[in-house]
Amino acid sequence: MSVAGAANAAPRFKGPVEATVLSVVDGDTFLAEAAIWPGQYIRVNIRVRGIDAPEMKARCPAERDAALDARALLAELLGEAPVSLSNIAGAKYFGRVLADVTTSDGTLVADAMIGSRAVRPYRGGRREGWCG
């Protein structure tokens, strides 16, 4: 990587960081309290890396229904136990972070959500719509 490329690369924190899920926003985002240092916690929205979920502010009834289903599935997967965050970086719209999320039983959240077909794989770029 060139010096310019290295300077412009988004910083990432390898982790893992333990986090307690406080609420689920939608099918790919949740609010968590993350333990960043002993006795130090932050509340932050976490976007699950590698997935695209239907939007809660939907363009059609089918997308809204799919968004509610995806949110319910994410809440079920995350459960009550702490989760582990790794490969942590600022998301496109900073104010939330992008991370790989693993449940307490070792389930990779993105893989489980994609396997359920409630969400689509996402690697950046333009996303497909959910209404057509």
PLM regions and their residue ranges:
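Small beta-barrel nucleic-acid-binding modules, primarily SNase/OB-fold domains
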Residues: S2-G132
